[in-house]
């Protein structure tokens, strides 16, 4: 929810090519996040811990990206 609010705020400040560039960068980041979390989870043996590791990694990466957007692009914190 926090990331959606931050992304919406950022997109609202951009127009035209800037918004398109942000959308491309954000889409690439989402792909990286998902693939990285899967990679990390695959390093664990099959079993229930694997899904947990993937979820925790997704949450951690999302939190870090959201904080980066807030800091670098001047988004007000909640």
Question: Each PLM stretch: what is its role?
Answer:
Residues 1-78:
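N-terminal alpha-helical modules
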């Amino acid at each position: 929810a926090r990331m959606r609010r931050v992304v919406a705020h950022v997109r609202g400040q951009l127009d035209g090519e800037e918004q398109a560039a942000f959308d491309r960068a954000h889409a690439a980041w989402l792909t990286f996040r998902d693939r990285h979390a899967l990679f990390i989870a695959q390093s664990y043996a099959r079993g229930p811990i694997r899904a947990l590791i993937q979820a925790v990694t997704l949450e951690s990466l999302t939190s870090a990206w959201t904080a980066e957007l807030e800091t670098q692009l001047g988004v007000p914190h909640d």
